[in-house]
Amino acid sequence: GSVLVDVHIAVESMITVSEGHQIAEQVRFGLTEQFPEISDVVVHVDAEDDVFDDSLPDRGELLRLLEQCWKEYPPAQNILRTNLHYLNGSIRLEVCLPFTLASSPAEASEIAYKLKRRAMEFVPQIAQVQVLFTTDDD
């Protein structure tokens, strides 16, 4: 006979999807190597503090809200990447901007502060905003 295994693992909440997939593959491989009678393993990866809340806006809706919120703030027009983390019934927002946007650490701090304040006032479900300045352009 064949043995099917269904495993749920909890991972640190801020890891990337690709890292979660890598962890799942390592678990799957480890189980099938250690127990040859296992024919298939399904690994479910969940954030340790992952709680589904249907009142939270989805990505499309949230990005539209942020676009409205930041439309009058020129630095926001340079956002390279936006990552969302749905955790504990709220949203943690991660925004990446080009390093060249700020001419000094003080200016970078001011840009970050204004983006955070506007986002958290406009979208009450946002609990945290992290603004990153990067030299990457992709």
Residue ranges of each PLM-predicted region?
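Peripheral (non-transmembrane) domains and long loops of multi-pass membrane proteins
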Residues: G1-D138
